[in-house]
Amino acid sequence: MHCPFCRHPDSRVVDSREADEGQAIRRRRSCPECGRRFTTVETAVLSVVKRSGVTEPFSREKVVKGVRRACQGRQVDNDSLNLLAQQVEDAVRASGSAEIPSNEVGLAILDPLRNLDEVAYLRFASVYKSFSSAADFEREITDMREHAETRAADKASGAETVSVD
């Protein structure tokens, strides 16, 4: 690692710690040439493979932007959107794969969005799942009602559910 101060091509790691809830490693380094210290943060790169085959780095901002569009006119704050994006990133990282298809990112968005705002969920799902008729919306609304009833029943019985849609 080059020193950012004197550009010396080597540095020594003084301390390493987990950061960002284990998603990154923060390293404190020292330059043997100038003696100054600096910090680096290392993260595993997560790439999204688009339908065209092109890969690009996963972006929480892109998730927030897409979900924000679905939430337009709804009472959803930025903190909730950022939390949703973090949940999506955690879910796709949990797959253990360095490259994830874009449709899996979309699937990872659906469940947390359903829990956040049902109208925004319907808007997002209608685009993501390519709804072409009112029947598609009706079917999705029926699924949402069943999902809500199941969650309510599980909550009443004290059971915890994990949704696998």
Swiss-Prot record:
Residues 46-136 form the ATP-cone domain. Its cofactor is Zn(2+). A zinc finger (unnamed) spans 3-34. GO terms for biological process: negative regulation of DNA-templated transcription. The keyword Hydrolase does not apply. The keyword Transmembrane helix does not apply. It comes from the Bacteria. Binds 1 zinc ion. One of its GO terms (molecular function) is zinc ion binding. Pfam families: ATP-cone, Zn_ribbon_NrdR. Keywords: ATP-binding, DNA-binding, Metal-binding, Nucleotide-binding, Repressor, Transcription, Transcription regulation, Zinc, Zinc-finger. PANTHER family: TRANSCRIPTIONAL REPRESSOR NRDR. Belongs to the NrdR family. Negatively regulates transcription of bacterial ribonucleotide reductase nrd genes and operons by binding to NrdR-boxes. This is Transcriptional repressor NrdR. It comes from Rhodococcus erythropolis (strain PR4 / NBRC 100887).
